Amino acid sequence: MKYFFMGISFMVIVWAGTFALMI
């Protein structure tokens, strides 16, 4: 479960960074 949460957090950070670059 811990690794699953870490994976979700990592994906959210990557998505946020990509979204910020697109703006």
Curated annotation (Swiss-Prot):
TM stretches of this protein: 3-23
Bilayer topology: Single-pass membrane protein
Entry keyword set: Cell inner membrane, Cell membrane, Membrane, Stress response, Transmembrane, Transmembrane helix
Location relative to the cell: Cell inner membrane
Cellular compartments per GO CC: membrane; plasma membrane
Primary localization class, coarse: membrane
Induction: In exponential phase, strongly repressed by thiol oxidant diamide (at protein level).
Database matches in InterPro entries: YpdK
Record's protein name: Uncharacterized membrane protein YpdK
Organism: Escherichia coli (strain K12)
Phylogenetic classification of the source organism: Bacteria, Pseudomonadati, Pseudomonadota, Gammaproteobacteria, Enterobacterales
Gene designation per UniProt: ypdK
